């Protein structure tokens, strides 16, 4: 297939679309992202959260003022420990191309059999489930609460995580089977 100027036009690549991939692999997909919170003590905290696509179960992995590559890799180790027996089900982790996610972060996950899938640049829709949870957390909690410091932020995020994972009505027909 070519155009009048003799250049080849590309056709759509073979294989599933992004949405088909997400639906067919939901049981095996985790998604993570960082978000920031401004604290009343004048500092900014970075929060790393992971969500399971199939169950929408959220894990707030950590809060820090300085998210280094080593800290982020440690949060990956903590995630694997937290997943425990369920870690074998996870096959993919969707993340953005942020500089906080180093090769060590990816290596920790790869050792557990989890392949890192990078989002395209400026394509928040590729990580829409994580972005939606972060947006909900902001609207329902962070925009309505004065947060003094990191210990206070950790406490309210832990409470919100519990509320989200245990007390919210399941969506998309999912049940509490894996919560």
Question: Which ranges hold each PLM region?
Answer:
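Charged DNA-binding/catalytic regions of mobile-element recombinases
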Residues: 1-179
């Amino acid at each position: 297939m070519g155009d009048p100027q003799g250049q080849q036009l590309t056709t759509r690549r073979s294989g599933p679309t992004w949405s088909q991939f997400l639906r067919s692999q939901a049981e095996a997909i985790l998604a993570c992202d960082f978000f920031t919170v401004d604290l009343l003590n004048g500092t900014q905290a970075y929060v790393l959260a992971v969500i399971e696509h199939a169950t929408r179960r959220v894990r707030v992995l950590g809060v820090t003022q300085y998210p280094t590559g080593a800290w982020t890799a440690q949060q990956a180790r903590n995630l694997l420990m937290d997943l425990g027996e369920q870690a074998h089900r996870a096959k993919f982790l969707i993340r953005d191309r942020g500089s906080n996610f180093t090769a060590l972060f990816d290596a920790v996950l790869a050792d557990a059999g989890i392949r890192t899938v990078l989002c395209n640049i400026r394509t928040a829709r590729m990580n829409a489930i994580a972005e939606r949870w972060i947006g909900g957390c902001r609207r329902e909690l962070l925009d309505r609460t004065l947060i003094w410091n990191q210990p206070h932020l950790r406490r309210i995020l832990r409470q919100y995580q519990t509320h989200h994972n245990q007390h919210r009505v399941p969506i998309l027909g999912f049940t509490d089977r894996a919560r």
